UniProtKB/Swiss-Prot annotation:
InterPro entries: ExoRNase_PH_dom1, ExoRNase_PH_dom2, ExoRNase_PH_dom2_sf, KH_dom, KH_dom_type_1, KH_dom_type_1_sf, NA-bd_OB-fold, PNPase. It is found in: Cytoplasm. GO terms for cellular component: cytosol. Belongs to the polyribonucleotide nucleotidyltransferase family. Residues 691-701 have a biased composition (Basic and acidic residues). Keywords: Cytoplasm, Magnesium, Metal-binding, Nucleotidyltransferase, RNA-binding, Transferase. Residues 547-606 form the KH domain. Involved in mRNA degradation. Catalyzes the phosphorolysis of single-stranded polyribonucleotides processively in the 3'- to 5'-direction. It comes from the Bacteria. Its cofactor is Mg(2+). NCBIfam families: polynuc_phos, PRK11824.1. It comes from Streptococcus pyogenes serotype M12 (strain MGAS2096). This is Polyribonucleotide nucleotidyltransferase.
Amino acid sequence: MQGNPLVVEVGQVAKQANGATVVRYGDSTVLTAAVMSKKMATGDFFPLQVNYEEKMYAAGKFPGGFMKREGRPSTDATLTARLIDRPIRPMFAEGFRNEVQVINTVLSYDENASAPMAAMFGSSLALSISDIPFNGPIAGVQVGYIDGEFIINPDKEQMEASLLELTVAGSKEAINMVESGAKELSEDIMLEALLKGHQAIQELIAFQEQIVAVVGKEKAEVELLQVDADLQADIVAKYNAQLQKAVQVEEKKAREAATEAVKEMVKAEYEERYAEDENLATIMRDVAEILEQMEHAEVRRLITEDKIRPDGRKIDEIRPLDAVVDFLPKVHGSGLFTRGQTQALSILTLAPMGETQIIDGLAPEYKKRFLHHYNFPQYSVGETGRYGAAGRREIGHGALGERALEQVLPSLEEFPYAIRLVAEVLESNGSSSQASICAGTLALMAGGVPIKAPVAGIAMGLISDGTNYTVLTDIQGLEDHFGDMDFKVAGTREGITALQMDIKIAGITPQILEEALAQAKKARFEILDVIEATIAEPRPELAPTAPKIDTIKIDVDKIKVVIGKGGETIDKIIAETGVKIDIDDEGNVSIYSSDQAAINRTKEIIAGLVREAKVGEVYHAKVVRIEKFGAFVNLFDKTDALVHISEIAWTRTTNVSDVLEVGEDVDVKVIKIDEKGRVDASMKALIPRPPKPEKKEEKHD
């Protein structure tokens, strides 16, 4: 635990919840409360809700905005809630339909002790000690990789230096959730990292088991969703053959139509048969569930026994691929990637660094330069549905693509732009998040972003009966829905840049992980072949519509000169030239415009503002003021110098105004700059000194 104590407190707070814990990890403190509804929900899914609530007081901060109160969850909070939900969800019994809520509240925040990992530990423990029928415990850890060594739960400094940012969770027996970004690491290193993480998980689970043995409650007896056995036997006998035939239709829409026709026929028959039965609603619910189970069983049987996939592909075969660049005019870059019936359009936008997103959460405020947003409209699957703000799934898929592509982006010094990619899923039959990564690569290269290497992504699946298993390459929607695993792998030819794994069973073995990673590598290379055949490398120039950029370096103490009082000077420059200007704390000035002449003019203005007089240099100056003791001349911009009366000429000057007048141009040489920055100049230093007159010899009589 990197020297941070892990302390668990039970029984002091939130005692009316089914289970509650306070987990103190370092100085991070998380309260987790788990509650369960008394009755089974009416829906056809398990209604589990996991929240991760960031309270700004935990970091000693005021919330932003007018209301000064926490609002909707941040992106990080949403991703953390998903991170906890995913390993917990498979640990409930099939048919369990009671609503369960797991609420994690961050009460104190320590950036060197992961609050999300404390929340995951607390979520598992709160469920385990409660009467909620949870088949845990589970635990999760973060894994870093520095100088060939794996580090469990690295602190902030270590994570910044790490080549790997991996979160892995699981039960005592197996891993059941993975989320990772990596700097092109090999499959062997990633597999070893997962196994190292699982060893640490087993220790944390042993700790939980000790606590559960002392304070755990007896699990409640709850009703599980079970169908009527006689009804099931009747439907299977009559209609299984027809449904099997429908499932084997290869094209998605045709298959959906065929299976739906069989289901509607069955529902109509049984609705008519039991129309007068007072339990009609329950019967029809069972009919729908039986049909779902029949389709589920047939898809899995085809794959495991006949080695036939619903669309006729081989186990390790990728759907037909197509890659297009420059799909859109005017934008800064675009790429259209199609894999079978999954299609994503990615659009690139470049902007000045002033457009970076400011992230103000529990961690210290920072700026985010690269954004990857993922949109999944309902028309992509031929359905109507909700439109509005991005949901948890869209946020999660966007973050996965962001991790995958971020690893190959040029540094800020190499490419001083803010970068935004938007993935529009136009058609979906599984693996749309991986299509968005491929489309993003196309858009970046088409837009002239000098990425280190193209990135491709692939989704792997699994069908397992507990003894035998089959790993699938490039899963489609039906295989994802009825399968046991969704394992997404993205990377370059050099190595992996992102992983994400979710499973519906208790866990998977190292052997399955190794096989899935090997198949994914082969598939990734095939996809990269198609991408590189379309565009082999990033274009050497940006799109004509993209903002041009130039940079100059100024001294840090000159930043205030360029900005001016209240931003007056920089605003005046922007108004005059029409450019955008960003200045960082180190004096790097970035100038953005589509007009190169405007950039050049801005550089001249700024260079003049920060220019400093130097002793020994000669300037063509203008007299701006005359005093009895000398004349003030303007060297450049706002820099004036004093030419003392004694420095005007080698001969004695009685009256300055007899020699100089305001507005006159003169050449001067800087001879002195004092500690206060006051400049003394000389005119006579540029004039040859006249020879001294010869002394007349005295004559003596």
